[in-house]
Amino acid sequence: MATASVSFKSREDHRKQLELEEARKAGLAPAEVDEDGKEINPHIPQYMSSAPWYLNADKPSLKHQRNWKSDPNYTKSWYDRGAKLFQANKYRKGACENCGAMTHDKKSCMERPRSVGAKWTNINIAPDEKVESFELDYDGKRDRWNGYDPSTYTRVIADYEAREEARKKYLKEQQLKKLEEKDGEEGDENVASEEEDEEDGLKIDEAKVDESAQMDFAKVEKRVRTTGGGSTGTVRNLRIREDTAKYLLNLDVNSAYYDPKTRSMREDPLPDADPNDKFYVGDNQNRLSGQALEFKQLNIHAWEAFDKGQDIHMQAAPSQAELLFKSFKIKKEKLKSENKDKIMEKYGNAASEEPIPRELLLGQSEKEIEYDRTGRIIKGQDVALPKSKYEEDVFINNHTTVWGSWWKDHQWGYKCCKQTIRNSYCTGLAGIEAAEASADLMKANMARKEAAEDEPVRHEEKRLATWGTDVPNDIVLDKKLLDEALKKEGARRKEEMDERKRKYNVKWNDEVTAEDMEAYRMKRIHHDDPMRDFLH
């Protein structure tokens, strides 16, 4: 209700006021009228339709919502394009030197530059243009349709109508051509009758509607028509499908999840129901139907190609990715067909070959064959066994058996010489004996190696004794050699004290004897010995 002043109302009056507003919104009561006689839309909320208290409005009105600060000088008119004003007969001072118009200068002139301007010729002086200036508001400056003439769109409509007429004419010609080809041999009467039937079948009669399906739609409620946009004269029941929202198909909490933000339900809400009776089986069906699979394959191909170094990106260049995917599929099919042809050329095609004889399939035939006691054929024709594609009974390189007549250690060979190398020369019994001898020698070597691994040689004791870490108890030292070793050790220690006395022709002896080790031990200073200071 668009009331200006707020006065106290009883509970009954307030209830009647609410009922009146609901009736106006439903279109069952006439809308409220303002002081100018215009109807007020009942759907306008009260905080917008009620005038403020300081306006002292006695009657309902919407004037307080109008722009009372509007500029009276504002106009929606636009430039008069191409309008001309006064045209002079001779050049005027300050006019354009090229055309002679006063509204612009030579730099801004839009005419073709003359060889001799109007300033010097006074010929063909151009008229002055109509220059206008408008005061536009914020929206007017940004209105892209400001100054648009709707009548110019009639040319577009005319183009579409001409195109539609040409299309209908072409379709009619094609239909007549088909009818003439189909009924060229029949009479003119039959041709005319069938042509009419064909045209009637091609046309769609929009007036034929099933009345039983429109019974609910025919229910009309009488309502009052208002100009405020609140309701229309007749309101039909548009919800006649009687469908159910997908989130109401199964009210179980543990059923398919419904996302209210995206309005999606991926899983099937009724998985146990009959598929023939279900209209909705979940949004995942759209991912496995239509062009979704092709788009998925396209994305996978783009990812794999990018990983292999191809400069391809599905989002940055989708057309390029699609063309590359098409060329990839063509090459793949071509390669597949080439491989198939090679295999069929090499092994043949059992599907296209001649059928197998019946006697081979069933194991019997109607042919009568008689044999004697030795197995020879007396009467009838001998059954020719199928030949192998390999040459049979052909001995090469002096072999007496064919390749594959001998098998040993997962290898094929010749039985005559027991060789496993194909196309080798036959060695006969000598080759067999040599192969056996080499095999026996290999076995003996392997047995000897195993025995040697069981008893390792003791070289470690000799090395330990040489370096003095472990000296046997039964060692016998020569006194002369020991004295010489002591002298040599003393000389070596003196050389360590002063290496400058060492001569250039020194001969070193790397052999270490037991006497040398004993002399070294006797001359060595033990750091833990308390009498080490009295040794020298």
Swiss-Prot record:
GO molecular function annotations of the record: pre-mRNA 3'-splice site binding; zinc ion binding
Keyword Coiled coil: no
Compositional bias annotation for Acidic residues: 182-200
Compartment(s) where it occurs, according to its Swiss-Prot or TrEMBL record: Nucleus
Region called Disordered, residue ranges: 22-42, 178-201
Function statement: Participates in the second catalytic step of pre-mRNA splicing, when the free hydroxyl group of exon I attacks the 3'-splice site to generate spliced mRNA and the excised lariat intron.
Protein name: Pre-mRNA-splicing factor SLU7
